[in-house]
Amino acid sequence: LFGVLCRDPTMMDIELMANAWYNIVWLDLEHTPKPVDEVIRLGRAISHLGMVSVVRIPELSRTHVQLLLDGGIEVIVLPDLRNADQARRFVQLGKYPPIGRRGFSSTTARAGFATGDDQEGLLRSANAATRLLVMFESDQAYEELDDILSVDGVDMVTFGGNDWAVGIDLFGDQ
């Protein structure tokens, strides 16, 4: 799989990435002041062009998680995760029951703008299609890694080497 992290992409950039056979486009809300509605529009274009939309949120908040997932974003990244309690909160916000407690609306892209007759199946399908990625960037998170990995509903884990290096005064040391 090939992907790219984009700080400030345009719709044309997204189309060029699709033509270049990228699989994943990672949009950044942690270090880029892009409006959420614009990120959702870009995410929909990414998905419609056959790529996977990934968005790193600036902080753990219901507003960011709910709006992005309802808008059709496929992978949400939580940066600077510190412990399993934060991971559990992320899952509660990002997954529907029985895994989490995400709020449900039938007027969303992810729900196909309708619930249909099989609402339980819709929730199962949405949970299966939604990926929650946690990013650890500190010694504290590393020390609690086993507890974090045991949280049901956390789908992927990565680390942020730059912030971690800054946090332990190693940035720039080679």
Which residues are covered by each model-predicted region?
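Generic hydrophobic/aromatic pocket-lining and core-packing "Φ" positions
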Residues: 14-15, 39, 43, 65, ...
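Conserved anion-binding
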Residues: 63, 75-152, 161-166
